[in-house]
């Protein structure tokens, strides 16, 4: 299995043999588990005060008075403490001791990563995610791409490769999130576009492009390759990143 290595102007420089990882079996079930396990590590434990709603001297009147046997305040008939009362405790509040992290076996996690890498070369899966691209997959740049320092040069290279339309798609997808997340630092939602994987340092010049993630090959994980648990992200590799992928096989 071979791939064409492109120059920064989009011309074919030469061909490269792809490592065994690109022949990995597609396992969407493992990919989903690996992504959910990663996401669960970012959950923050939270819980209510155990005394919330309990700070009252209310007591039940007992039987024989024709009223419900619930705790009532001393100076009247107002109900307190129970979940159905105003100001009462919560019925089943969140608890800090709840185990939030989802575990996954080490071998399953590694297989999920290999499977997600292979899935990034399936044109049908990539298009199903909504990505826009031209040519065959995988997309590979020569190592000079890692030396680019200006965002304008990155845009020119992506345009020559025929994938900048996908960045524009992500740029136009930004919208205000529905729900309480708007008050919690998550006001906007935006689609993911290109993932740029380099052999050395991450490509800093691509950080401000809409929906683009730039990482070193040793920082790869299932969530980067399958955002939202859906595999087939449009991925651009450098030649040195492809060579280092042999360590994952």
From Swiss-Prot:
One biological process term from GO is: translation
Which is one Gene Ontology cellular component term of this protein? ribonucleoprotein complex
Q: Which SUPFAM superfamilies match?
A: Ribosomal protein L4
Function, as annotated, reads: One of the primary rRNA binding proteins, this protein initially binds near the 5'-end of the 23S rRNA. It is important during the early stages of 50S assembly. It makes multiple contacts with different domains of the 23S rRNA in the assembled 50S subunit and ribosome.
Describe its partners and assembly state: Part of the 50S ribosomal subunit.
Q: Which family does it belong to?
A: Belongs to the universal ribosomal protein uL4 family.
Protein name as annotated: Large ribosomal subunit protein uL4
Q: Which organism is it from?
A: Methanoculleus marisnigri (strain ATCC 35101 / DSM 1498 / JR1)
